[in-house]
């Protein structure tokens, strides 16, 4: 009987020890889990962006990163005017995320067997037809005229050709297109010829209007596009290496959250954002940047909305020239989060 009493007294003590061990085990597991999350969150995300609308939407995140106010840890590459600058770093793994033209994203995807994914759309159409007179009121008014343009062999050319054809103008014989090496060359023609007509991207079109008296936007090609198509012109997207997405999902989600907020800041606080844009050398002067922001169609589309816009636009580019998108239309795994 005494032995039974002694055993009964031991049982509560054993239960207490077991409960303590269980609590310690759960606590250690929780600590380990937190450690993994912290490690993922603290990975340095290497980001590249083109100097233009894509970078204009990223300036608040860039500034927050500099000030140590960003949630993620970022390393921003030097801004570039040449989108091909980021091709090799992306394929080699030297950059994790980059803002690039939508068709270039497709080309990289095809050339790397799915090595990148689109995270979001960041820029819609940025092309404008500009002139110093008032001879152009619609696309049809370009028939028989000479047009100076930039972007040969890239999305500006394919977008222009499609719009012209849908408006009954043969892009090869219905007008004369003189392709310029860059916007500076196109601007020189406008400055020296009062009757010159040009296709310029934003924010350079706005900058040109500050340099050439009487220069005006005759046509926003976004408007001309939506008159003939259901999808948008998708100029720019942000992509990530597929391996990086798999290895650091939390870092990708954090970047997207902060990037979306940065884009909203640019659109909602144009004056303050313009100061940052000028400070990073994207546009020479803040007043010009402030005027250009509403015309740059800086946006943030993700998920199904992103896929619908990008896939529709890529299909039209493919129909114009299959090589413009890398030869084939990307599969569904091209689109992050779907």
Question: Where is each model-derived feature located?
Answer:
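Short, low-complexity disordered leader/linker segments with a strong preference
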Residues: 1-44
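Short, glycine-/small- and polar/acidic-enriched structural segments
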Residues: 40-169, 177-179, 196, 202, ...
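Second-shell loop/turn segments in exported
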Residues: 45-46, 95, 145-150, 189-195, ...
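A bilobed periplasmic-binding-protein/Venus flytrap-type ligand-binding module shared by bacterial periplasmic
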Residues: 60-61, 127-136, 232-251, 302
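Short, solvent-exposed loop/beta-turn-alpha elements that line the ligand-binding surface or hinge
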Residues: 66-73, 223-231, 298-307
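Pocket-lining segment of extracytoplasmic ligand-binding domains
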Residues: 103-104, 184-277
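Secondary-structure end/capping motifs
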Residues: 245-320
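Conserved C-terminal helix/tail region of periplasmic/extracytoplasmic solute-binding proteins
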Residues: 311-338
């Amino acid at each position: 009987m005494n032995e039974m009493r002694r055993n009964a007294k031991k049982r509560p003590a054993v239960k207490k020890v077991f409960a303590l061990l269980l609590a310690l085990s759960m606590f250690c597991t929780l600590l380990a889990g937190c450690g993994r999350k912290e490690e993922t969150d603290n990975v340095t995300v290497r980001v590249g962006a083109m100097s233009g609308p894509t970078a204009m939407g990223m300036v608040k995140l860039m500034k927050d990163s500099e000030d140590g106010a960003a949630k993620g840890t970022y390393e921003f590459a030097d801004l570039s005017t040449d989108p091909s600058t980021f091709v090799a770093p992306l394929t080699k793994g030297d950059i994790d995320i980059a803002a690039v033209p939508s068709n270039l994203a497709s080309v990289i995807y095809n050339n790397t067997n799915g090595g990148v994914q689109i995270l979001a759309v960041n820029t819609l159409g940025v092309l404008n037809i500009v002139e110093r007179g008032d001879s152009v009121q619609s696309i049809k008014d370009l028939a028989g005229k000479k047009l100076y343009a930039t972007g040969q062999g890239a999305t500006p050319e394919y977008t222009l050709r499609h719009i012209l054809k849908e408006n009954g103008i043969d892009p090869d014989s219905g007008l004369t297109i003189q392709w310029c090496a860059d916007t500076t060359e196109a601007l020189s023609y406008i400055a020296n010829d009062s009757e010159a007509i040009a296709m310029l991207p934003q924010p350079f079109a706005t900058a040109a209007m500050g340099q050439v008296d009487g220069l005006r936007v005759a046509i926003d090609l976004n408007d001309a596009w939506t008159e003939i198509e259901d999808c948008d012109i998708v100029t720019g997207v942000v992509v990530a290496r597929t391996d990086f997405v798999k290895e650091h999902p939390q870092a990708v989600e954090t970047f997207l959250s902060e990037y979306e907020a940065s884009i909203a800041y640019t659109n909602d606080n144009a004056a303050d954002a313009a100061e940052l844009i000028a400070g990073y050398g994207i546009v020479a002067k803040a007043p010009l940047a402030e005027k250009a922001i509403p015309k740059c169609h800086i946006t943030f589309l993700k998920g199904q909305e992103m896929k619908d816009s990008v896939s529709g636009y890529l299909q039209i580019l493919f129909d114009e020239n299959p090589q413009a998108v890398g030869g084939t239309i990307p599969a569904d795994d091209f689109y992050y989060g779907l």
